[in-house]
Amino acid sequence: VELPHPVTGTAFASPVPPGQGWPDDLAAGDTPVACSASDVAALAADASLDQVTACSSVCRACARLVQWREDVASTKRHSFAGEPYWGRPTPGWGDPEAGVLIVGLAPAANGGNRTGRIFTGDRSGDWLFAALHRTGFANQPTSEHAGDGLRLAGVRVVATVRCAPPDNKPTPAERDACSAWLDREVGLLLPSVRAVVALGSYAWTAALTTLGRLGVSIPRPRPKFGHGAEVVLPRVVGAVTLIGSYHPSQQNTFTGKLTEQMLDDVFTRAAAVAGE
């Protein structure tokens, strides 16, 4: 069954096949598909940023995640039953020459897995993009769907794992399989990135691991995560400052553990570090 895209009105199947005109979809019908962790590593090794975006968006390396993301896309949450679900991996998105890189955990089953854009279509994204708008990184305060006119300047958002995982918990093997996409994307962004904001302890650990693999000096013992935690990581040219933030999950925002001001302060600090 094909259903109309909420922004463009074009009809799509769920999951969305590549090359059908979904907003911001860089994949085509002949984009190479990774079916194993070794495939991911091979395809990511010398890919451009656009190629990472395209190839990672059709990845099928992790059977459990493929099954879950596509099952969710087929069954759909009742409130979204009339629209198509992306149902594919959600690639990094934003400024290709960003001074600030935001690292999250994974897309939400009815958020990024539905809309095709990271942190888009759920409460966490509502908080994140509103904060990015208040701090000058986004041209509008909302992110509802790919194609909605949102643009980021000076910042890019990536996920540690690109598929929505059951219970928001990827396995270590799934994290490791996806890490080659993350390593390549971060490596391509590193010439411009001065600040990395990790949303939650999982992203903090992943960011340290990725940066270490890319040649950035990581202190021992490893710096501990905390909201507002900050560590300067030396590299051959300049340094990268890693900044921790509580994840803007409903668990944190509803309870007041994370407030709008706390999130704004993190991005204001990141902007200052990056000179944005």
What are these regions (language model features)?
Residues 4-233, 238-275:
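A polyanion-binding, active-site-adjacent surface
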